[in-house]
Amino acid sequence: MVYNLGQLAQQLNAQLVGDAELNIYRLATFEKAAQGDITFVSDKNLLTRLDECNASAIVLPNSFKQGYQGNALFMETPYVGYALLARIFDTTPNPQPAIAASAQIHKNAIIGQNVTIAHNVVIEEGVVIGDNCQIMDNVVIGQYSTLGENTRIYPNATLYHQTELGKRCIIHANAVIGSDGFGNAPYQGTWIKIPQIGKVIIGDDVEIGASTTIDRGGLSDTLIANGVKIDNQCQIAHNVSIGAHTAIAGGSNVAGSTKIGSNCIVGGCVAINGHITIVDNVVVTGDSMVMRSITEPGIYSSGVPAQKNKAWRKTTAHTLKIDDLFKRVKALEKQLKDNT
């Protein structure tokens, strides 16, 4: 695919400086860009290295209009420009609407217009598939589930019964949505399984990463609001509620019945306790453990950064002595007070 720089400027709503007829063939990184490529700069440190870049054009911040003489598109946020360019130059396969002969579709399922259903897909009774959906190989969609229009489900994903997906959702490979939550009642040294009779309801424009699991609710539903982005290998337990446009990075776990607000960012490998609430506009940095509710917006951390093993062992040894040191300091303070 080929676009000239003027066309790209129009699609990005960017200010063009340079040759509007210049042909652009690819989007590339700053370091590897060559002639015919366009790149972007969102890292301020790279602004001092523009003479090292071999790209035919660069997306730059508006604040740098006086600092570059080559072909450029100027935007308030070049990273947004990168996102839009990635959409333009996207090479993800886009299969033509068709239903494979090997697909197993219940006679009572409702299939919309221009739908792709690939090999060995199973669509059970009462399922409703919206227009322009793409369902890849080996996907299973359980009874009475619904898919909004323009939703894409990648191979080997499983949607249990009564799962609801909104419009324009993306479900990546091996994701499992609507499996049983971890509900068991202790009884005389054993466990009684509690059937999970809620469901999972997912809004519009949600993306669920590969091998992520979202459990169905016990009594109430597990709710994922519009625009939520959940990375790979995350666990979202039963009855959890995640607010609009919150993003959760890979390997994070959210325990049951926790409510996460809107526009939050949860870093990788974060563990969030159950039955707590996190308000809107909270950032939790990677490897943190959230044990109590967060009631004020802000950035929260609890992870321990890596250090050399010898230093870490020394720090840990000191940590084990904190209680004893605290008692000694209190005793010294009392002694000092008594002597004055």
From Swiss-Prot:
Please provide the record's keywords in A-Z order.
Answer: Acyltransferase, Lipid A biosynthesis, Lipid biosynthesis, Lipid metabolism, Repeat, Transferase
Biological role: Catalyzes the N-acylation of UDP-3-O-acylglucosamine using 3-hydroxyacyl-ACP as the acyl donor. Is involved in the biosynthesis of lipid A, a phosphorylated glycolipid that anchors the lipopolysaccharide to the outer membrane of the cell.
Q: Which family does it belong to?
A: Belongs to the transferase hexapeptide repeat family. LpxD subfamily.
Question: Which species is this record about?
Answer: Psychromonas ingrahamii (strain DSM 17664 / CCUG 51855 / 37)
Please give the HAMAP family that the UniProt record associates with this protein: LpxD
**Catalytic reaction(s) noted:** a UDP-3-O-[(3R)-3-hydroxyacyl]-alpha-D-glucosamine + a (3R)-hydroxyacyl-[ACP] = a UDP-2-N,3-O-bis[(3R)-3-hydroxyacyl]-alpha-D-glucosamine + holo-[ACP] + H(+)
One example GO MF annotation: N-acyltransferase activity
Q: Which GO terms describe its biological process?
A: lipid A biosynthetic process
Pathway(s): Bacterial outer membrane biogenesis; LPS lipid A biosynthesis
InterPro entries linked to this entry: Hexapep, Hexapep_transf_CS, LpxD, Trimer_LpxA-like_sf, UDP_GlcNAc_AcTrfase_non-rep
Subunit annotation: Homotrimer.
Superkingdom of origin: Bacteria
Cellular compartments per GO CC: membrane
Q: Name one Pfam family in it.
A: Hexapep
Residues annotated as the enzyme's active site: 238 (proton acceptor)
Asked whether the keyword Lipid biosynthesis is assigned, the reply is yes
What are the annotated disulfide bridges? none
| EC number(s) recorded for this UniProt protein | 2.3.1.191
**Key word Transferase present in the record?**
yes
Q: CDD domains from the xrefs? A: LbH_LpxD
Question: By which gene is this protein encoded?
Answer: lpxD
What protein is this chain from? UDP-3-O-acylglucosamine N-acyltransferase
